[in-house]
Amino acid sequence: FDSFWFVQQWPPAVCSFQKSGSCPGSGLRTFTIHGLWPQGSGTSLTNCPQGSPFDITKISHLQSQLNTLWPNVLRANNQQFWSHEWTKHGTCSESTFNQAAYFKLAVDMRNNYDIIGALRPHAAGPNGRTKSRQAIKGFLKAKFGKFPGLRCRTDPQTKVSYLVQVVACFAQDGSTLIDCTRDTCGANFIF
């Protein structure tokens, strides 16, 4: 792997695309961690064969922070989500970050990359109104020094686009922010 995508999700938007059933994250009003995804040559590396199995005991010291910062917003089972993310993504960076280090890295990234805190001074926080991709990217670059990636989903009925994820891109060391080069949002979206 040569870099990371640190992906935070906006639970109200994520939940709005769920077709049925309850969504435990619908009431959350802060960005939560979706995952820390190793990248290689511009592609997400997944399901790496040499990885070790998820072991909750290796991250028990982080569990209270993970419950807050990395909840399963779709189903009330956080450990299942962490296991999925470790197996699908984390194992691909295990040569550098073992399981405990991987989850600690994600917690540290979330604590240092506070999206709402960066947008609030610009009155650009979540209010269900139209936002400009250029403005949001600019506010986040002004705060953190590098451009994020913005990921949107479009409602198939209304054709309205909603911000669902913000990606912070990091070098292989997991601490050096780099510019993200990919967005899935158009010029404007609801947030």
Swiss-Prot record:
Phenotype when changing L74A: Decreased affinity for uridine (CpU substrate)
Gene Ontology CC, one term: extracellular region
Keyword check for Transferase: no
EC number, as in UniProt: 4.6.1.19
Recorded consequence of changing R75S: Slightly decreased catalytic efficiency for uridine (CpU substrate)
Residues binding RNA, per UniProt: Q9, H34, N72, V73, R75, F81, H84, E85, K88, H89
One GO term (biological process): RNA catabolic process
CDD domains, per the entry: RNase_T2_euk
Family membership: Belongs to the RNase T2 family.
Protein name: Ribonuclease MC
